[in-house]
UniProtKB/Swiss-Prot annotation:
The keyword Iron-sulfur does not apply. Component of the ubiquinol-cytochrome c oxidoreductase (cytochrome b-c1 complex, complex III, CIII), a multisubunit enzyme composed of 10 subunits. The complex is composed of 3 respiratory subunits cytochrome b (MT-CYB), cytochrome c1 (CYC1-1 or CYC1-2) and Rieske protein (UCR1-1 or UCR1-2), 2 core protein subunits MPPalpha1 (or MPPalpha2) and MPPB, and 5 low-molecular weight protein subunits QCR7-1 (or QCR7-2), UCRQ-1 (or UCRQ-2), QCR9, UCRY and probably QCR6-1 (or QCR6-2). The gene is QCR6-1. Component of the ubiquinol-cytochrome c oxidoreductase, a multisubunit transmembrane complex that is part of the mitochondrial electron transport chain which drives oxidative phosphorylation. Disulfide bonds join C17-C59, C31-C45. InterPro entries: Cyt_b-c1_6, Ubol_cytC_Rdtase_hinge_dom, Ubol_cytC_Rdtase_hinge_dom_sf. The keyword Transit peptide does not apply. One of its GO terms (cellular component) is mitochondrial inner membrane. This is Cytochrome b-c1 complex subunit 6-1, mitochondrial. It is found in: Mitochondrion inner membrane. It comes from the Eukaryota.
Length: 69
């Protein structure tokens, strides 16, 4: 029955798109490193996190929808 399982192509496509989104990832990692010592909780890297995933999503979307048609 394991051979009949449907594999989600999104995870594979996300992995294949990660090399194209290195710049936003590095910006996110730099932000995380910068705010590690912040005990106030006011600093965050939400913008950089979303920029990274927006890059991944923009790369994945056309490939994913082509597979779903």
């Amino acid at each position: 029955m394991a051979d009949d399982e449907v594999v989600d192509p999104k995870k594979y496509l996300e992995e294949s798109c990660k090399p194209k989104c290195v710049k936003p990832l590095l910006e996110y990692q730099a932000c995380v490193k910068r705010i590690q010592g912040d005990d106030s909780g006011h600093k965050h890297c939400t913008g950089q996190y979303f920029d990274y995933w927006q890059c991944i999503d923009k790369c994945v979307a056309p490939k994913l929808f082509a597979k779903l048609k």
